[in-house]
């Protein structure tokens, strides 16, 4: 009967023909389902790979069947037009018997060179690759690596991911070029190193005993008194006069013979100690004298390229620095790289550039997030008042919004029952207090008892919208 025979063939039993008889007509479907050639069934046939290879055609002049090399089976059977070698162990996919490194890649002198093999040293097609795989003294051509361990391939396109992040997930197998950054630090250096006489100091570690460490002397009186934790400041800190959120300002007076020359350095930077007289800071503006030679050296180290046809480097336009250095593909104007020496900074340590355009962000918010690197002007005239003119307790506080027509008070009646009159007008000349109260008194003192500024504004706005002043003695 055919049904028991087919069931026995599907179960793996049978006569060593891979579990399927040619009489049943199920050989092709069973091979497509992966049931053929089951490694030796219960009937002792044990066909395995040998029987499967015996039924599959061998075509020496054709390419090897990749599916057969990987799985040991072929769904097309004897109708497959590729080669099915009996010894699968001698190929790349032969059950892991030989890895890719031990493969002998074919040398085809008349064919083009395998680019993937020349860049990575391996070939994923193995012996089936139709390109030429040259060898140099029996070894693969070496690939140069940069300091980060990524391949340097001159003449190839730069790896965009590496140029943005400094890393490459493909490692040495990446086919693109990974240039050196030329020692440019990944983070821009805003703070220049402290320039002070190098003094050799003893160090507890023997390997660090020969280090030359710059140690600026501590200036007496450079502590901040007050309720905060005492904090020692270096003698190079800029002593700014004027308004400060701290309870007391830094004492700029140097006592004794330890008087040092204090020059203004970059923002929060350390000053340079010299032998000239001490600079006297007067007024809210502080001269910003940066080191010209040091800035020029930094520009020479970075070597920012000028590419007139390319867009401007936005990071360089904002900060004056570029972490990519000479490898940056954008334009870096020379005028921004010129050292800006001798310009002034205001009491907020923001640059004053009289000929430049005012900083719109500073005019709206009162500060600038770019600091001294901002290329725009930060005048103190944009503020409504000088922060250092009056203490906070004596500053006048306006209870009305800007542009609001303040309703003036009529002469108050001696009777406490009568409500005060309010006269609203658009003429600024008449908008003045008609009460005999002095004009220098605060706003709260000219209001009658029981009347608050919020109530005053509400009633004044109501009278303004009604189209005229209230009648004498009238209320609400």
Curated annotation (Swiss-Prot):
Region (Disordered): 1-57, 290-309, 456-476
Entry keyword set: DNA-binding, Metal-binding, Nucleus, Repeat, Zinc, Zinc-finger
Zinc fingers classed as C3H1-type: ranges: 59-87, 108-136, 153-181, 307-335, 353-381
Pfam families according to UniProt: zf-CCCH (PF00642)
Polar residues composition-biased segments: 290-301
Regions of compositional bias (Gly residues) in chain numbering: 34-51
Compartment(s): Nucleus
Main location: nucleus
Any one annotated GO CC term: nucleus
GO molecular function: DNA binding; mRNA binding; zinc ion binding
Compositional bias segments (type: Low complexity): 1-10
SUPFAM superfamilies: CCCH zinc finger
UniProt xrefs under SMART domains: ZnF_C3H1
Name listed for the protein in its UniProt record: Zinc finger CCCH domain-containing protein 6
Source organism (scientific name): Oryza sativa subsp. japonica (Rice)
